[in-house]
Design a protein with these regions (language model features):
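Beta-strand-rich domains and repeat architectures in extracellular enzymes and scaffolds
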Residues: 36-71
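C-terminal motif of bacterial Sec signal peptides marking the signal peptidase cleavage site
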Residues: 21-24
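Conserved Ser/Thr-centered positions that define the repeating blades of beta-propeller domains
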Residues: 73, 127-135, 179
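Repeated scaffold domains used in trafficking and secretory/extracellular systems
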Residues: 42-46, 88-100, 143-156
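Bacterial N-terminal signal peptides that target proteins for export
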Residues: 2-12
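Short aromatic loop motif centered on NTY/YTY
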Residues: 140-187
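Bacterial signal peptide processing site
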Residues: 26-29
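Short beta-strand elements that form the blades of beta-propeller/WD-repeat-like
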Residues: 49-63, 101-120, 153-170
Length: 237
């Protein structure tokens, strides 16, 4: 089950979205299994998303490419921030972090393949930072019964003080433009003078023109050949 960091979970609970709905309503048997302590998997950390030479997402303690812990790392600023478990590594869409100041970041989440949602769907969050990744806030960007596959239809991009969330719809895309100012909570009314917008990509076809992550990476990647060496007995201890 997706684990959302406590600081982000508190924000989502305030707006009336329980942490359980971020992943799925599961059977009692599976809920019992997920309530057990997470084993320590004998695997090396992987960089699954790199912004530049000192900023990246580290994937750790994973059983496979869809179930692990993610951390945002900035070696220059000495930042290591928990991004949760079974979340960002499952996002299948396009991601561009291109704020030249380095202050504003976004990392969308999804759920592992074949996640069973409740009859009201899965509410799926993104997390964003306005302080260079020291802290993150959360908001829901998608409600769906198939978060893993549906995330393929999304493009997320940060450019300076703007966050773009674009959902592909047939031959076009619907784009919501969010303002990113220091400490903003995008789940609440914006401060005076701060505005966002929405539009179709066909109306503003150049809105992402020239935007790129400094490393050039636009998707999460994971080496599926790396698997735990622990045997079942070791994992159960």
């Amino acid at each position: 089950m997706m684990r959302v960091p406590h600081s982000i979970a508190r924000v989502l609970l305030v707006i009336g979205i329980s942490v359980l709905t971020l992943s799925a309503c599961v059977s009692d048997e599976r809920r019992s299994r997920y309530s057990q302590p997470i084993p320590h998997y004998d695997v090396p950390a992987q960089v699954i998303y790199r912004i530049d030479d000192h900023r990246y997402v580290s994937f750790e303690n994973y059983s496979d490419c869809f179930h692990g812990d993610a951390f945002y790392i900035d070696t220059r600023l000495g930042i290591r921030t928990d991004l949760g478990r079974e979340g960002v590594e499952n996002f299948q869409g396009k991601l561009i972090n291109a704020d030249p100041s380095g202050r504003n970041l976004v990392f969308p989440m999804a759920a592992p393949p074949h996640t069973a949602c409740s009859d009201r769907s899965c509410s799926t969050p993104l997390i964003y930072s306005t302080d260079s990744g020291r802290t993150f806030h959360g908001m829901v960007y998608m409600k769906t019964f198939n978060p893993f596959n549906r995330s393929k239809d999304y493009t997320m991009a940060v450019n300076g003080d703007r966050l773009y969330v674009a959902e592909k719809i047939q031959d076009d895309a619907y784009v919501i433009e969010y303002p990113l100012v220091q400490g903003i909570d995008l789940t609440k009314p914006y401060p005076p003078g701060v505005r966002g917008s929405s539009f179709t990509a066909s109306w503003r076809p150049t809105y992402l023109s020239g935007l790129r992550t400094p490393s050039g990476q636009e998707r999460f990647t994971c080496d599926a050949s790396i698997r735990p060496k622990n045997n079942a007995a070791e994992l159960s201890q």
